[in-house]
Amino acid sequence: MKYDVVVIGGRVAGSTAAYHAARLGLSVLLLERNPEIGTPVQCAGGVSDSFFKSTGLKPLPEFTCTRIRAAAVNGPLGARIVTENPVVRGYILERKSLDKYLALRAAEAGADVLTMSIAGDLIFREGSVSGVVFRGPDGVQEVECGMVIAADGVQSSIARKAGLETGFRPADLCSCVQYEVAGVDVDPETMEFYFGSRFAPSGYLWVFPKGEGRANVGLGIRRKSCSERGPLSYLNRFMEERGFKRIEFNAGAVPVCGPIERTFTDGLLVVGDAAGQVDPLTGGGIHLAAECAKIAGEVAAEAIESGRVDGRFLSRYEMRWRKKIGKNLERSLKFRKILDGLGDEELDALLRSLEGKDLSSISKISLLRILKDYPSMLRILRDIL
């Protein structure tokens, strides 16, 4: 077998990269380790309207559950604010269905898709990645290619085999657990977030409505906070207090340390969770993965067309994605580090300072004015305002 591009990983990042490479005329092979694309689910499923604007996708009923118009943030000591800021407007997705839709779109654009296919090693020619060794339903196989796009998740081994430093430390990871629940009475248009040591130390708990009495209820906490109690114990207590009925369980890890230092090398690009292209504050990665994967697919097409798959040429991928989302990631990382340092009383005070305010168009300037009477909050936030 021989292809222009082999994409490893069939989730949002991999399928999106495969689609854009294929639509630009490349021969593409997409390898997914699981028997079924979209499972197991490792995502809460919330996206903003900007996801659809930037990807060109339409919020089709095949993979959207509910329209979100507001977000409620609950503090550890009772503070609560609700915002209808345009930035929170979006949809809750049926993630399994989205992943399948994106893989189907890639296939319709011309990509070959193989499930139950685990990439185990890379093939090199003159120091450049030039193929993949994988184990599929028919045994171990080798495939030659012009280049590889690694979208194999937070524990990416492929990028490391190419010489890139992608190993995340335990302190860099957020442990996430989630139930899909039934029989819940929640506002179908409002996402709920809970902060504080009781709910999710160094993280947050979420309730995302899916309509018809269903919701995704989960939490993510930093690994450093898991020494005494695991994330599941916090989630189970919340579930028991509210009497939610569990119908599905999912778990995973998310890198919240910002992107890896380098996302390219000779013959290979890294995208999505494998590259740390995740919002360090929220842990959200669907939108960022799609943005960066589009760039990866386009750069792959440019590289194959020009006959240049060396790292110097492929560095344009990193320059483009950092220009597009780099500043936002840096800002989110600062916010996350500051929030990590807040105790329950400070978190609640911050939320109470915003109660009754018009949050529909809040900006950093207006936030400064709101907090002018809270010197301790200004001290905490001064690095990012």
UniProtKB/Swiss-Prot annotation:
Residues annotated as signal peptide = none
Q: Which UniProt keywords apply?
A: FAD, Flavoprotein, Lipid biosynthesis, Lipid metabolism, Oxidoreductase, Phospholipid biosynthesis, Phospholipid metabolism
**Requisite cofactors:** FAD
**Keyword Kinase recorded:** no
An individual GO BP term: membrane lipid biosynthetic process
Alphabetical GO CC annotations of the entry are: membrane
| Pfam families registered for this protein in UniProt | FAD_oxidored (PF12831), GGR_cat (PF22578)
Q: Tell me, what is one Gene Ontology molecular-function annotation carried by this entry?
A: oxidoreductase activity, acting on the CH-CH group of donors, NAD or NADP as acceptor
Domain of life assignment: Archaea
Q: Where are the transmembrane segments?
A: none
Identify the metabolic or biological route this protein is part of.
Answer: Membrane lipid metabolism; glycerophospholipid metabolism
Role description: Is involved in the reduction of 2,3-digeranylgeranylglycerophospholipids (unsaturated archaeols) into 2,3-diphytanylglycerophospholipids (saturated archaeols) in the biosynthesis of archaeal membrane lipids. Catalyzes the formation of archaetidic acid (2,3-di-O-phytanyl-sn-glyceryl phosphate) from 2,3-di-O-geranylgeranylglyceryl phosphate (DGGGP) via the hydrogenation of each double bond of the isoprenoid chains.
User: PANTHER family, from UniProt?
Assistant: DIGERANYLGERANYLGLYCEROPHOSPHOLIPID REDUCTASE (PTHR42685:SF18), GERANYLGERANYL DIPHOSPHATE REDUCTASE (PTHR42685)
Q: What else is known?
A: Reduction reaction proceeds via syn addition of hydrogen for double bonds.
Name of the protein in its database record: Digeranylgeranylglycerophospholipid reductase 2
Organism of derivation: Methanothermobacter thermautotrophicus (strain ATCC 29096 / DSM 1053 / JCM 10044 / NBRC 100330 / Delta H)
Q: What taxonomic ancestry is recorded?
A: Archaea, Methanobacteriati, Methanobacteriota, Methanomada group, Methanobacteria
